[in-house]
Amino acid sequence: KAPAVAALDRLLASDPPQLMHRSYVDRITPGIIDEDFDKLAGCDWIIEAVVERLDIKKSLYQRLHHAICADCIVSSNTSTIPIRLLVEDMPTEFRQRFAITHYFNPVRYMRLMELVRGEQTKSTVINKLADFNDRILGKGVVRCSDTPGFLGNRVGVFALQVGINEAIHCGLSVEEADAIMGRPLGIPKTGVFGLYDLIGIDLMADVVASLSQILPDGDAFHEVGGDNKLISSMISNGLTGDKGKGGFYKNTTEGTKLVL
């Protein structure tokens, strides 16, 4: 359970804080799939948030189907994969209780939540998820069509890829690119490289790969979503962004950022 416990420590140390109150960490029970899967049996709602790979998600759903109670709702936090692909191998009773609930990072501060319904998802399930996220979690629920990337990432990931590719093509430094492609263009103050760090460089690589696999051949995304040698090299060297030892930037003990 060491990785899960370490994740809680990072959660408490994060700046800005990721919890509304530090004491709320006591509501989180760390665990790992191989040892604690039986604890899911009594859950009312399970949110899957594993790596953005269809094969891994499908394998997990097969295990979940045999472990959860008959009325448990299951949703995925996938940011790109259509629901029809996620549950194509699952029985009807699982599909009826399955949806996509995509939260944006950092979840505490980003109000948007994308809700996607499958062809067989029950209306009662969708209405429960919409109501809970609206009234209890205070989210702005947007019901999306079942298309790759939904709304936010279908546009946002394309924009990030264009920004990074153009910065490299034009020979801009990380600071120059983020100064231009930040607040002046209505992008968060992180800019594009800083946002890559915030999301996670390894996660972004999975997201880009996922969209590249499931979008049709003629889609414009393929012009900007190919393999990036710089990104691959950074991941190989452990530079995965804010959650690791740094990415395009590195946080210092003084609370400032250094460009790597």
Give the positions of each predicted feature.
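N-terminal glycine-rich phosphate-binding loop for ADP-containing cofactors
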Residues: 1-260
